[in-house]
Every structure is written in structure tokens, then in C-alpha cells.
Amino acid sequence: MSLKRRFLRRILPPALAFFLRMLLATVRVRELGRAERLPGIQGRKRLIFAFWHNEMVPVVGFYAGRDIQSMASRSFDGEVIADTLIRLGYPAPTRGSSSNNGRQALKALARGLREGRDVVLTPDGPMGPRHKVQSGVLTLARLTGYQLVPLAFRCRPAIKLGGWDRMEIPLPFAKGCAIFANPITVPRECSEEEMDALRDHLEETLRTIDEQAVRLLSSRAA
């Protein structure tokens, strides 16, 4: 690792964690569907949450400190993200991705579920295509038997960054809307055609609740 990267690796995580804590403390968030749709709230059955990669900032900032297992790639960006998440109070993320050490990463996430932690994944990460579900999140739900919960978390006003995912960062004192959809069960004995149908269903659900969150934030009811 170059001297520049070692320097950035040292200063970025604490700076990002501080920034996210301060920023999200000013955001007024409205949660929809969490209490009435999630069986884990009552019985504490663990769940797998899926949200688009461009909504990572409000999700990890608002739910900081929760006992939630996540995943970060083995790239330099993944190193920075992993260290930032730890500083935000999350357990150390599982390292890997669908294209790099994916099988071992899924096993580690499954172990986290068995040990009593919820799991969060971005089904279009770590490098896209944007808003296209990859197989990893569905495979994890199929192999473990834990339900998959689509989540949308949008904020307004927000700035949109460049890059493949067009990540959004809420501005101070923004309004936020987090919508939890109905849990999805992926049968263990699932054919390729059924997996394709579930992938389409997850994509459509994420798209629908994402649009719903934007509409609510644009209305006076938000």
C-alpha cells in the first residue's frame, strides 16, 4: 500500500464516522412498515435487509451502533468503509463480494445470522450495475432460511455524487423516509426459474418503495 493510501486509510474512517454521526443527528426520519411488517420486531427472528447501494449513507448513519452484520469489499474503498462502520459501532464487516471470495463471505454472513445478528446487504453492490439485483442476497436467504426485507431510505434535500451508483448524501436538517416492505421468503429448494422470478420481484419491490419514499418526501405529509 502506498504512503498516500496508508495516510488516507488512517484519517478517512474517523473523519467519515464523525461526519455521518453529526449529519444524521440533524435529519428527521420517518419509518414506515417497520413495526407492522417485520416479524423480527416481536419475536427477534433475525432478518436480511436489502437496499440499493446509493442509499448507504443514510442507512449506515441512522442505524449506527446496532448489532448488524454487513459486508465490505476487499478493495481500498472497502477497507475504508469497513473501518468507518466499526467506528460507527457496527461489528466488523464480512470481507468479500459476489466477485471476490463470495462463497466464504456468504458463509460468514450466515454465521452472523445464527449468532443473533441481522444482516444488511446492497444487492447491486459493490460495483453495479446500478439497481440490478445480483444473486448473493437471494442465495444467502435461500441457504439460511432467513427472510429478506427490502428497504428504501431516501432523504430530501440531498446531493448526488458521481460514480456508478450516483450515491446520495442528505444535507443537514433534511427529511428522511425509510420504508420497509413485506419480508420475502426464498425456498431452499428453489429452481433457477424461481430464483430469476424472485430477483425480478426484489428489484420491482425496491423500485416501488424507493419511488414511494421520494413521493412522500415531496409531499407535505413527509
Model-identified regions with their sequence ranges:
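A short, well-structured juxtamembrane/interface segment
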Residues: 21-46, 52-58
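Hydrophobic beta-strand scaffold residues
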Residues: 92-93, 119, 148
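Charged phosphate-binding loop/patch that engages nucleotide di/tri-phosphates or the phosphate backbone
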Residues: 200-222
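A cross-family acyltransferase "interaction/gating" segment
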Residues: 132-192
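Short gly/pro/ser/thr-enriched loop/turn and capping motifs at secondary-structure boundaries
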Residues: 77-79, 101-102, 127-129, 155-160
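Catalytic-site beta-strand/loop segments enriched in glycine and acidic/polar residues
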Residues: 108-140, 144, 201
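Catalytic core of membrane glycerolipid acyltransferases/transacylases, capturing the structured
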Residues: 46-100
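A transmembrane-helix-recognition feature enriched in membrane-embedded lipid enzymes
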Residues: 1-33
